[in-house]
Amino acid sequence: MVFGDSLSAGYGLRPGEGWVDLLRQALPAHQVVNASQSGETTAGGLSRLPAALARHKPDIVILELGGNDGLRGLPPDDMRANLEQMVAMSAQSKARVLLVGMALPPNYGQAYGRAFQMVYSDLAKQRKLPFVPLLVEGFATDRTRFQADGIHPNASAQEQMRDSVLKVLRGMVKN
């Protein structure tokens, strides 16, 4: 189950173009559920996760949240607490977590950006989670790979996003 925000929900893309749809195609022997929601913060995800876990009963949760927390300037400590609770909830439901990290545009300042990114790496290390440090790895500064808003990757970036996740996910699934 992919549990994320607009980057995983396929914001601004045609149906079937998003990285989660491409992941589903790459793993035909597995059921890939997209429980992502555009605009989702970690607080919103925390409130939605229990129902999603109960409904879908996933073996793996790909947790891709926090970008909207950062874009709103919310405290990284709050984001970390919410992510920690979601990891714990997932573990309680017997699901393994693959954590997906984010980065912020530089206009948020170096200190905030560093604290924001450290949430992911610290949590992955502390909880020994499989980890994709940056969903937009390899094209984060390439404006041609983003929609007009400069935040959401366009269709040309989706395979690379899928591949970043798949590289780590393959070690978690049996094919």
Regions found by a protein language model. Give the residues of each.
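Alpha-helical cap/lid subdomain in secreted, periplasmic
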Residues: 22-26, 47-175
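Serine-esterase "nucleophile elbow" of acetyl-processing enzymes
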Residues: 1-41, 48-57
